[in-house]
């Protein structure tokens, strides 16, 4: 008798397409931000791009906590324990609130010191842009943490359409606000920061209100959010802390290599910023697939069904290779037309073209196995392995080799991006070997027991 699958193709697509749209909106609005602020000048675009590297480090902290909550909640649902799933959802929101407020306070107090530490060689004009943008966006961190927690709760139930609809509202406010503040009110760098703060606050309020509805299966209540239970919190942090350490160190590594790039001046900083925007387009499907992998594999692990864990991991990886490859090919084919949307000097544009070619060309073959596959391991509680591999690879290749190529050999931004590709290859070798060996199963059994 043929075994019944936990997810049909229709259910997988229902989970995936809202995630893809949500990622697409986030990336496209981010691109629009960069295009708008580029009209203010290259000092402005440099300031925003540098602070966004630090902001991305903070965002990964919130994302790691949300991943921990999503894994635990999905596993409870897979094991047919809805009450425990609802409990973990409430605890996730409470932890998110604490983390968001704490991180915001830390960043506001140390913002000048952080910028001097990471980007001490930048001009005064760029530093002023950094300070303005960092101060305003730091105020939005509590709202972002709460939004991430709420979105993770809905994804755990397979209802990613909710977070997508809220994302449409959030990004709509952000885009319209940017246009108003930059072009009409002439607010400069602050014009792309204030709408970010407002939109994140609105998004957090909406998604938490939806999660608190009486008819929602994982309904959060004031009691579930504020009364922490050691066992549930420990389960969330068991996944969240290694993920936070891994992802935050990864982003810190990105900040440090950008500080290397900043040694080569505004042209390299601006080209790197634009290239990061365009690279993100090629990763839209992959990022969505990574989020879906958490939900799907978490359910399989909760049900202790390792055959279906293998089946869905391979299936989602195949889908990602096909879809992400197609998107990257399109970006490369129309790269010159896309770059023409930015206000760049010829030298900056030429360097941005080279960087995008390196990233998007290689990601067709390397990105899914390097970044989507480890989410399957995380959903199976194999978080320590992914943390060790990702951290070691980042330190040795993304940072160490970047220093050699970028600074010692004078290759600038191009050297950093070559080192990034080597980092991807190392990650793939380790993660594929781990998955194929089946060594991850011992952690899945131990935590589910």
Regions of interest found by a model, annotated:
Residues 27-46, 115-124, 180-187, 248-281, ...:
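Helix-terminus/linker motif at the lipid-water interface of multi-pass membrane proteins
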Residues 45-105, 144-163, 258, 269-335, ...:
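Small-residue-rich hydrophobic transmembrane alpha-helices
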Residues 66, 136-155, 163-174, 192-207, ...:
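Short runs within selected transmembrane alpha-helices of multi-pass transporters and secretion channels
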Residues 14-33, 136, 170, 199-203, ...:
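Transmembrane helical elements of multi-pass membrane transporters/channels
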Residues 4-35, 39-40, 56-68, 72, ...:
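N-terminal transmembrane alpha-helices
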Residues 42-53, 130, 134, 193, ...:
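Small-residue hotspots at the loop-to-helix junctions and early N-terminal turns
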Residues 23-27, 60, 100, 104, ...:
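Residue-level hotspots within the lipid-embedded alpha helices of multi-pass solute transporters
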Residues 1-19, 73-140, 182-241, 297-363, ...:
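Short alpha-helical transmembrane segments in multi-pass integral membrane proteins
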